Amino acid sequence: MAKEDRIEMQGEVLENLPNATFRVKLENGHVVLGYISGKMRMHYIRILPGDKVTVEMTPYDLSRARIIFRAK
């Protein structure tokens, strides 16, 4: 899938779930299941509840999102 097909949104982590997944509330109010991107895993970037994150979603499954950036 081309990068242009991805939807980027801002959100806030609500809770940690098993297997490095998170419940993320998007700025439009929807709650999705987020998982960490590979580069964030590789560099051991920790995500805690309350963190502001940027997520990337595919138009085919709007209930899951990849966390690609954690704001400071």
UniProtKB/Swiss-Prot annotation:
According to UniProt, the name of this protein is Translation initiation factor IF-1 1
Gene name as annotated: infA1
Subcellular localization: Cytoplasm
Q: Which GO terms describe its cellular component?
A: cytosol
What subunit structure does UniProt give?
Component of the 30S ribosomal translation pre-initiation complex which assembles on the 30S ribosome in the order IF-2 and IF-3, IF-1 and N-formylmethionyl-tRNA(fMet); mRNA recruitment can occur at any time during PIC assembly.
Which terms in the Gene Ontology molecular function aspect does this entry carry? ribosome binding; rRNA binding; translation initiation factor activity
Q: Which InterPro entries match?
A: NA-bd_OB-fold (IPR012340), RNA-binding_domain_S1_IF1 (IPR006196), TIF_IF1 (IPR004368)
Q: Looking at the keywords, is RNA-binding present?
A: yes
Protein source organism: Methylobacillus flagellatus (strain ATCC 51484 / DSM 6875 / VKM B-1610 / KT)
Family (UniProt) = Belongs to the IF-1 family.
As for what it does, the entry says: One of the essential components for the initiation of protein synthesis. Stabilizes the binding of IF-2 and IF-3 on the 30S subunit to which N-formylmethionyl-tRNA(fMet) subsequently binds. Helps modulate mRNA selection, yielding the 30S pre-initiation complex (PIC). Upon addition of the 50S ribosomal subunit IF-1, IF-2 and IF-3 are released leaving the mature 70S translation initiation complex.
Q: Locate the S1-like domain: which residues?
A: 1-72
Q: Which UniProt keywords apply?
A: Cytoplasm, Initiation factor, Protein biosynthesis, RNA-binding, rRNA-binding
Q: Which residues form the signal peptide?
A: none
